[in-house]
């Protein structure tokens, strides 16, 4: 769960200690990229048993077990890129600022500001995926919450040609229906006191006036679309795996038929094979519903695989941005180059 540059520093430190102290290391992880990078010998486990073992080269180049092959093929293949000219702009952000005051003293006077987001500008087209990558504290989540009007901000946010900063009450409610967010933690984002029918149907209770039978029909339909069984609606979040919980979160957002989905680290808490399943699901529903995505992550390899355009953030500002292919083939900023090198990407 470390940022990519910190991850590299920790790995380098471990390898240095191993060499100088002549130590052996048992490294436990679900990150196959790191396993391939540092391991001499690999054991693959499933359900408490070692199902395959061998040298790193043998495991990665000639796997024998079907489960090992599945793991190695689980790297996200990315969303379908629409290279044709997109129809229109769905979101425009200009000079967005999210500053949190620093108050000190007996009178709690403002002594300065934490500039979580500072003068950010970008646009997003229909059916496009914009990747936002940066380390912890770079301002990614604050930017997402500001776009959704969940925290105060300054600057211009235009969604479907409507300035969100001027919206109130009913008009703001309409926007919230059209722009949904899927959070990082599938364990903390679902209420443990609500069953799946209540969780997925909560948005309908706010935004739609429909009969109970129609409500249940819509819930069952959306559960089916995200790969969950109908008989799950009476169960509670603690009865599900992390991947299933994230599918429930996707269903909750998707049932309102939004135009924009903000995905805030949606796979970082999941195992590699489950990550791939969730990414493939997101790809499928984007194509089916013509959705626009803002995909937030500190995993630059994942961002590369899913994004049409990328924004690199650091300390609340945009360090570099551009089309995915151009940004990776010809990065201009040292920070971008550092992220790419740390992820072993070319």
Describe the predicted segments one by one.
Residues 35-37, 303-305:
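A short, surface-exposed alpha-helical micro-motif characterized by mixed small hydrophobic
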Residues 50-54, 62, 321-322:
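ABC ATPase "signature
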Residues 155-164:
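Conserved ABC transporter NBD signature motif
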Residues 58-63, 106-111, 164-180, 206, ...:
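ABC ATPase NBD coupling module
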Residues 213-231, 340-341:
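Conserved ABC ATPase "signature" region
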Residues 255-259:
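A short, proline-enriched helix->beta-strand linker immediately N-terminal to the Walker B motif
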């Amino acid at each position: 769960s470390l940022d990519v540059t910190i991850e590299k520093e920790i790995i380098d430190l471990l390898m240095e200690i191993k060499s100088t102290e002549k130590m052996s290391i048992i490294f436990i992880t679900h990150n196959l990229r790191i396993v391939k990078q540092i391991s001499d010998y690999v054991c693959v486990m499933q359900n408490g048993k070692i199902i395959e073992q061998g040298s790193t080269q043998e495991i990665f180049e000639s796997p024998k077990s079907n489960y090992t092959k599945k793991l190695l093929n689980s790297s996200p293949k990315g969303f379908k890129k629409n290279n044709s000219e997109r129809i229109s702009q769905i979101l425009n952000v200009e000079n967005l600022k999210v500053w949190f005051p620093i108050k000190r003293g007996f009178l709690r006077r403002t002594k300065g500001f934490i500039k979580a987001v500072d003068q950010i500008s970008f646009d997003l087209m229909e059916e496009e995926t914009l990747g936002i990558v940066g380390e912890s504290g770079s301002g990614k989540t604050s930017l997402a919450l500001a776009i959704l009007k969940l925290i105060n901000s300054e600057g211009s946010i235009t969604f479907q040609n409507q300035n969100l900063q001027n919206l109130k009450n009913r008009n703001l409610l309409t926007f919230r229906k059209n722009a949904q967010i899927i959070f990082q933690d599938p364990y903390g984002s679902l209420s443990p006191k609500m069953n799946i029918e209540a969780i997925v149907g909560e948005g309908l209770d706010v935004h739609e006036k429909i009969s109970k039978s129609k409500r249940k029909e819509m819930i069952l339909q959306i559960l089916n679309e995200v790969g969950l069984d109908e008989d799950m609606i009476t169960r509670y979040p603690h009865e599900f795996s992390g991947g299933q919980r994230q599918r429930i979160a996707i269903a909750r957002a998707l049932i309102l038929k939004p135009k924009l989905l903000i995905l805030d680290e949606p796979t970082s808490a999941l195992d590699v094979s489950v990550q791939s399943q969730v990414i493939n699901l997101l790809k499928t529903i984007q194509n089916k519903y013509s959705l626009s995505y803002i995909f937030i992550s500190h995993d630059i390899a994942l961002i590369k695989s899913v994004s049409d355009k990328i924004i690199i953030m650091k300390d609340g500002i945009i360090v570099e941005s551009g089309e995915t292919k151009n940004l990776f083939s010809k990065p201009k900023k040292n920070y971008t180059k550092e992220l790419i090198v740390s992820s072993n990407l070319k």
